[in-house]
Structure formats: structure tokens, C-alpha cells
Amino acid sequence: MAYPFHDIETKWQQYWEEHQTFRTPDEVPDDQEEFYVLDMFPYPSGSGLHVGHPEGYTATDIVARYKRKQGFNVLHPMGWDAFGLPAEQYALKTNTHPRETTEKNIAQFKRQLKRLGFSYDWQREINTTDPDYYKWTQWIFLQLYEKGLAYQSEEPVWWCEELGTVLANEEVIDGKSERGGYPCERVPMRQWVLKITEYADRLLEGLEDLDWPESTKEMQRNWIGRSEGANVYFDLVGADDALEVYTTRPDTLFGATYMVLAPEHELLDEITTDEHREDVDEYCRQALRKSERKRQQQGDKTGVFTGGYAVNPVNGEEIPIWVADYVLVSYGTGAIMAVPAHDERDHAFANKYDLPIREVVEGGDIDEEAYTGDGPHVHSANEAVSLNGLRNEEAKEAITEWLDEEEKGERTVNYQLQDWLFSRQRYWGEPFPIVFTEDGEDKPVPEEELPVTLPDLDVFEPSGTPEGPLATIEDWRETTDPETGEPAQRETNTMPQWAGSCWYYLRFIDPDNDEQLVDPEKEEYWMPVDLYVGGSEHAVLHLLYARFWHKVLYDAGVVSTKEPFQTLVHQGMILGETEYTAYRDDAGEFVSAEQVDDDADLTPVPVDDGDVKKDGDVFVLADRPAVRVDARSHKMSKSRGNVINPDDVVDEYGADTLRLYEMFMGPLEQDKPWSTDDMEGVHRFLNRIWRLVVDADSGGLAVSDEEPDREQLRTLHRTIKTVTEDIEARDFNTAIAAMMEFVNAANKWDALPRQVATPFVLLLSPFAPHLAEELWARLGHDQSLAYADWPAYDDELIRREVVEMPVQVDGTVRATIEVAADAEEADVLATAKEAENVARHLDDEDLQREIYVPGQIVNFVTG
């Protein structure tokens, strides 16, 4: 009887749904330990799941199923991050309402997830576009507003005419929108902004106690970008204003020979002289078409002289002011003092525009390059302060004290982190709970009037103006002042997609609560999330924003923990199948891949899998072994035609095969290429398990009711130990390898004893739950194995009875001996000496030392 995976998987998915097998009780138990395991919930795109999605979902499902068997009260929910620009763009492209497309996409995602057998508690399903959900998103915004953490500001922002919305910096690449590639320009616009900078230090400090990938923590540290330095004031020549500059190297002030402003700097227009205005204006127009990322990354730094001058406060020197796009208004003050002798960027700029370079720190050859290291200061003194002879840190401290005393500057901590631009001029997002009175004052909507619901529109395209589509709905926009009853207007911007995903993990705890965001008792029981799994692309934005909101809620007494996610894991990317490429020269001859360089004039030739073979760590042409081919796996994409739909895999091989294969591909965190051949091997493995328990001819049980022998028990208990430890370490691929070893051993036995089969099925169940449930039932159990106890291993049974040990004489292995695992040292040494090849090389009179490492090695050292 073949393994009937379609019938089995359908049967058990129906069983789990009908019995609500994985529903987590609403009430908090008195004495059961919790475990909250969470996936980063998906944006339900129109294309549905691809095979990359199930990787992380399978990993969390394994942990959830394992923890239930250990007696934990497990929370394992799923929901939908459905607001935002992608959903609206898809709706516009298909000419259907976003609500309709979102509902359709969610139904497709949910069907696919259920088909893969994930043990989600679907009773807790949430959707960020549900008014019952975004009521509380709006409520959180009001907490931010009341605490002064949400404010309006005229901000230079990326405006995309085609999309009709403002985009965040990270959504613009080289002056074009990330989605669609539409041109963008920087314009000032009224925006809601969240003061995340107020939490910068706490966001940094909180990283220390988190079990997160170090690379992710470092990305957040760099994004926050804390630095210590000084703000220095440079008086403008011929004007009453002063330029304020932030620098981390105030000790080099005596070496400042020019200044540079960002194109957006508020004083640029005042500083620019008539003679230079045309050049400055044109330069700024060009600069504002570039993204901040491109402005910083471009190798050739450009600029234009403004005609203005500023006074260096330490020596009274008048130095020229330039404008350059490598200076960002978003960092520091948007102005820098340039010290070309000791800054590489300033050095290149000074050489290009023939500006002075003045050494103030000894240690390098500034004619050749900037010296950025430590050293004694020179040429750094005025009548009141001298830095000469001081090294960098001493000089920084001395000049900062002087600046403070003279009121020419002040000690400052600065952050690269910017306040969070929180407005979108789109339709498909959470409305702001804010109204504006006739005199322009903004006021919060009373909490009892939440949610402010998103109106249904027949036409929801962007208006092409900063106001957004909601501004066109007069009967929705027009409202009253909640305090006076006078006419007022609603805020017509909407919140960004990040809003709903900042706090969803809390709503899963108490999804049906109409009175509060989350019940305090439930929150204290479940938080923080014990295991959070999702892609590394969210390392900064989502994870940083969620941490910020959580800390605000902590300060408000809504949550009991300072951090939301205790342990974070990023699953690796599943790449397309390996593609092979050979190269031919002009004569048509093959050129081996290791000889190919960028300058070679060669023709790439795709090679079929069957025409290559592996030779060590490389691939070669099967009929020309001397010719290496290029073997690469690429990210799955429609353009490459290498996207694999999980529905197709499940149709052909079953959900358990897909789950098991994705975990067996390699370590969870690594990128891995898809291999249909390897997946077929995993499917054969599941068939072998089926045949171990089920008779191939009769369809009855193939297990034996006889007592297992000691070797069978040892094999089982070693497998229990390995699988248990590997799940704890999230080494799922090696756990599967251990089960494969068990099956290989069991296939050599006359029959699989029931006492061995039963615990093995439990080991299998987190990985291949459908097959495990079926085998469990056939073994005579009338209840689901979902909450059956995880098997324990017996230390006595896994201890090796006999060990093999190498025996060395003067460091050279001369023999291998077998001894009892618990043998006394004297007995081991005696056995080692009796080994024929050891005795031949050993003279007792010359024996100097006997080295014995229990269970590992014996070494005799002679004179």
C-alpha cells in the first residue's frame, strides 16, 4: 500500500479544524508555563505564498508542536498586515477596491497555510484593516499625541507625483520610488512625525539583553547612530545669524578651512550672494532629485561656492561656505566644518576645488592623504586655549570645555536616527484620530468615538495633491470640534503600513477585547514573545518601530515588559534551483570558469543539469572534466522564471514532504538553493517511515508487539536525545538527519517494535504532523497526538557500552583498541600495551609518561 499522503493530509486538517485542536484557552491558567511563538505576519499579496514563506512558518510550527508536548501553554497565532501602499497599488492595477482584493488575497493565503498543516490558533486571527483592530492603532496614536511624541512639521519629504504620496527615505532609490520606479522629488510638506529620537538611548540600551542575531543588533545600533561631540557656532560675515555645526572632532577646529551646507539648509538662501545664486540654485535643483543614499554613496563629491563666509570661533579666520549634496540636512545640523587634513571626504573635496589643507594633528603625510588617526596636536592654539601636544581625546575635552565657557559651542550627543515620518497621502491606511478647527488647531478625537473608520470610496486613486484621496470626500471630511461643536475638518492623511504591525503581537493575546487594547493579566502572562521568526529585511524598520511603540506603551502602563521580542531568528532565503553556465571563446572552445574574468570576451552558455557532474567542491562538464562551469543559485523571481508555487509541491509530494524538505535543506538561518531531486529524496524517506509501520500489502500494522532488544532501545533513545537537543537549538536539519539514521537502522530489523514505533512517531510529529497523526491513530490511539507527552531518553541506554580508542606511541597512532565504556584506567592502559603494534614500538624501560583521556585516546611517551 503506497503512502496516501493526499487522503491523510486532508483527513487530519479537517480533524484539527473540527476539533479546534490548536485553540489556546482564553483564560490565563494558574500553574502552566507559557510559550509564545510568533511569525512575522505576512502582507497578503495577490500572488499568494511562494516556497520561501513556509520555511519560517514550519520552523515556528515545529517549536509550537514540540512545546505543547512538553506541557507548555502555547500561543501560536496568525494574521494579516493588509493596509498600505502595496495593497493599494495592486488594487489600482486590477481596477478593484483594495478591500475586495485584500479579502480575496487573505482567503488565498489562509487556504495555502491551512493546507500546509500549521498549528495556528485561527480563533485569534487578526487583520490590520478591520476597524475593530485599527481602533486600537488609533488609540496608540492618541497616547503618542498626548505625550508630545506625535507632532506636525513642515518636512522635506519625497513626493512621488505618480503614486500621489509621500514616501519614506527607504522607499526611494536613486530618486525613484522603490515600487514602480517612478521619479520623486524633495518638497516641503506638512507631515505627522513621531518623536522616536526621544527613545534613542533606551532603544540602544535595550538591545543588550535581547537574544537576537548580533548582525541585527548592530544594524539597529548603526541606524540609531549615537555619537558624542560638540555643536559649534560660526558667525556669518555680514549677517547677524550664526551657523551651527555638529562635529565629533572639535579638537580639529583649528584645521577647519571651509564649511559646507546641505542643499536644504534653511540659511543657504541668505548666505548665497547674487553673483553665485544661479549656480547654487541649479546645483540644489539637481541635488534634490537624488536620494540621501545616493548622495552619500556617490564617489565623486561635488559642490558650489555660495559666495558667503563664516568666522571660525577659535581663530577668527573667515572661511568660505560651500553647498554640497554629500551633506545631509537630516544629520546633525545640516552643516559641517571641513577639516581636509584629517577627514578623507574633506581632503578629496579640497583637492578637487583647490581649498587649503592645514595639519593640526601630527602623524601622517597630508599632502598624500588625510590623517585620521591619533597624535599630538599642532598649530592649535589661541590666546585662551592651547591644544598643542595633546592627543585626540585630551584635546577634544579641552576644546569642548573652552567652547562651553566662551558660549561658542556646547557638548552634544547626536543621533543619525531621525524622527519617524508618519503620514501617507493615500486612501488604504488607518485614518488619523485628529480634527482641525477653523483656526487650524489640531485636536484629538475622543477615545469613545474610536474608531474613525475609513469610508468606502468608488474612486480611491491618489488625488495627485498632498492632501490625499480622503480630502475629496466632503461628508466624511467635514465634522465638528469635539469640545465646542464648532465646524472642523478631519485629518485626510492616513498612517503608514508600519502602524498596524507595530503592536499586533499584543492583540493576538486578547483579540476580542472591546474595552482595552489588551487585558493586563493576559499581557503579563504571555509577554514577551518567546520566539519571533521573520526575514532579515525587517532588521531595522519594523523591529525598531515595534520596539519604540512597545516602550511608549510600557511608560503608559499598558505592557509589563520593556521589550516585545526576547528571541529573534531570521530564516535564510530559499533560492531557485542551481543554474549552470559554461563559457566559450571566439573560437567556440570551452573556457574553464576559474579562468573567466570581467574583461574576457566570452559567450555564456546555459548547461542542463544532466550535462554536469560534481568534482569535489566544484561542478564540471560531464564529458569534459577539465572544464569547470559556473554554478549559482538566484533569488526566486518572476523575471527569472524560477518561482515555485507551494501548491504545486503539495499536489505532487504532499505538505509533510514540503515541510520536512525545507527544514532539511540546511541551517535555518542560511540561504539555500532549491533542489527537486533532494525533495524527492525526502518524499522517499516519508514513504519508508510509512512502510515501517504499515504493511505494504495488507495495509495493516507492520509493527511487532514483542519487547524491543537493548540495541533497538539504544537506537531509539539516542535518536530521542539528538532530536530533542536539536529542536532546542533550532538545528532542524540535523534533527531530521538523526531520524533518517534511525529509519536506516530500523529497516535492518525483522520488525519495528511497537514500544519503539510509538515514541518515534512523536519525534516525527512536529516535522511531518499529518503522517505522524495517521500512524499514531493506527498504533491504537483515539486522541490526537498534539498534546501527547514528548518522549524522554534514558541516559543508561544512550551510554556507549564499548568504545573504540586510538593508541599513540610518541604521537603516532599505532593501534585502535576496544574497551568497556566504564573501564578503569589501569585496565585500559594494560589493554593498550598488549596491542601487537603498540608492544612492538614500546619498551617499558624507556616509557616516560602514560597519557589517558577517558573515552578518547591513549598516548605513551618514551625517552
Swiss-Prot record:
Keywords in alphabetical order: Aminoacyl-tRNA synthetase, ATP-binding, Cytoplasm, Ligase, Nucleotide-binding, Protein biosynthesis
Subcellular location: Cytoplasm
Superkingdom classification of source: Bacteria
CDD domains named among the record's database cross-references: Anticodon_Ia_Leu_BEm (cd07958), LeuRS_core (cd00812)
Chain residues that bind ATP: 638
Pfam families assigned to the protein according to its UniProt record, in alphabetical order: Anticodon_1 (PF08264), tRNA-synt_1 (PF00133), tRNA-synt_1_2 (PF13603), tRNA-synt_1g (PF09334)
Motif ('HIGH' region): 42-53
Cytoplasm among keywords: yes
Reaction catalyzed: tRNA(Leu) + L-leucine + ATP = L-leucyl-tRNA(Leu) + AMP + diphosphate
Placement of sequence motif 'KMSKS' region: 635-639
Molecular function GO terms recorded: aminoacyl-tRNA deacylase activity; ATP binding; leucine-tRNA ligase activity
Keyword Aminoacyl-tRNA synthetase tagged: yes
InterPro entries: aa-tRNA-synth_Ia (IPR002300), Leu-tRNA-ligase (IPR002302), Leu_tRNA-synth_edit (IPR025709), M/V/L/I-tRNA-synth_anticd-bd (IPR013155), Methionyl/Leucyl_tRNA_Synth (IPR015413), Rossmann-like_a/b/a_fold (IPR014729), tRNAsynth_Ia_anticodon-bd (IPR009080), Val/Leu/Ile-tRNA-synth_edit (IPR009008)
Gene Ontology terms describing biological process: leucyl-tRNA aminoacylation
EC number of this enzyme: 6.1.1.4
Gene Ontology CC: one annotated term: cytosol
Cited PANTHER family: LEUCINE--TRNA LIGASE, MITOCHONDRIAL, LEUCYL-TRNA SYNTHETASE
Family designation: Belongs to the class-I aminoacyl-tRNA synthetase family.
Protein name per the record: Leucine--tRNA ligase
